[in-house]
């Protein structure tokens, strides 16, 4: 009985995580609160291999031109923030590889080695020919490509080709992806804050 109780506590500990204001987008509309504990519908966690160089590249949102695609539909709902990043509900629109099995519109967080959390939404899927054999990293060692409005993007980011210079907290390698069982396109924009 004692062993079952310990396993139950361990399982509950994995499901219930303390609130961290810097770690969660409180406007995301997909969390539940119980006694100051935040419960989120977790789908998968992916721990990234060591040796990732930390580079976070960018692509122009205007490169998404197929008007029949989910990528295009999502960009019609997105806005450009003051630094040139495309966002939906304070989540960064990004392109990721197929290894994560996350379709366009999927909500996820990227945890960096330094503990910083970047709230993201899948805005595009990297073609397998543009990633390594694991379908995670590009030839530049990037596993997270931000979708941006290039004319509005900060000059230093454009010069370096790396979004890590957005702020000191982002100057760290990606440690893991936490993918939630929520898809913005399936839930619908009108129901997002409900």
Where are these regions (language model features)?
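Sec-dependent N-terminal signal peptides of Gram-positive bacterial secreted proteins and lipoproteins
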Residues: 1-23
